[in-house]
């Protein structure tokens, strides 16, 4: 079977799945200035930076674990809390307008998992699944934003991009978050809960402009509790970085 035929069959299969899920879950719509009483928005300031906390009553989250995350209210509107990244080169992406969110085109073609209780979503795009820096600049600081208004004890489950790396679970443990309290988007891409909380991005989707409050927050949590051996120099291996004598360095 040729690659073209395989590609066409894959496209047909995807369209069938999308249309079947239209029958199960109504396709979300864009709010466009309509009032939505199932979504509350709290405005706050951290070190002169403006942020928002979004609270959804009986809301949903749909994500592809990469470029698209849609926060959907009980009234089936896509919230401004949503993420819709689009690449502008081979590596980097920009967050687009809510109107560009993929669920407005394809709906939510995954079975939904219901969670009894409250969820704090820390979803921050595909890079935060594996990238050490994105984890600490995009994911963890969202907890600080949430804590400006609410107590973490209110949260039943934390919705995270991944916990497959050791540093992810370790970093969460410093905040009292245990593995049993976590749901990952790798396993569940469509969830619903009695309450869902989300926040705006800690550095406004600009990883090169991490806010000073965010760095101080990380320092307060992790540095004072670090009992590891001190080193003169630390080498961080980045996935997009190539070093010719890396094997010798690791030895």
Predicted regions and their residues:
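The feature primarily captures lumenal catalytic ectodomains
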Residues: 2-251
């Amino acid at each position: 079977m040729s690659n073209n035929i395989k590609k066409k069959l894959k496209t047909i299969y995807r369209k069938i799945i999308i249309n079947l899920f239209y029958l199960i879950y109504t396709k979300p719509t864009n709010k466009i200035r309509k009032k939505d009483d199932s979504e509350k928005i709290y405005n706050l300031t951290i070190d002169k930076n403006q942020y928002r906390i979004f609270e959804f009553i009986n809301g949903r989250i749909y994500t592809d674990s990469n470029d698209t995350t849609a926060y959907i209210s009980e009234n089936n509107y896509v919230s401004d809390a949503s993420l819709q990244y689009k690449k502008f080169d081979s590596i980097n992406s920009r967050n687009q307008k809510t109107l560009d969110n993929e669920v407005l085109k394809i709906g939510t073609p995954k079975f939904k998992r219901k969670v009894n209780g409250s969820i704090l979503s820390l979803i921050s795009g595909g890079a935060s699944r594996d990238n050490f820096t994105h984890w600490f600049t995009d994911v963890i600081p969202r907890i600080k934003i949430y804590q400006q208004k609410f107590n973490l004890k209110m949260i039943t489950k934390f919705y995270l991009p991944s916990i497959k790396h050791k540093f992810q679970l370790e970093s969460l443990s410093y905040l009292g978050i245990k593995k049993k309290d976590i749901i990952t988007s790798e396993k569940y891409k469509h969830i619903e809960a009695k309450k869902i909380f989300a926040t705006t991005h800690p550095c406004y989707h600009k990883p090169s402009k991490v806010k000073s409050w965010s760095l101080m927050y990380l320092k307060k949590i992790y540095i004072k509790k670090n009992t590891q051996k001190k080193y003169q120099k630390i080498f961080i291996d980045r996935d997009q970085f190539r070093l010719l004598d890396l094997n010798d360095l690791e030895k």
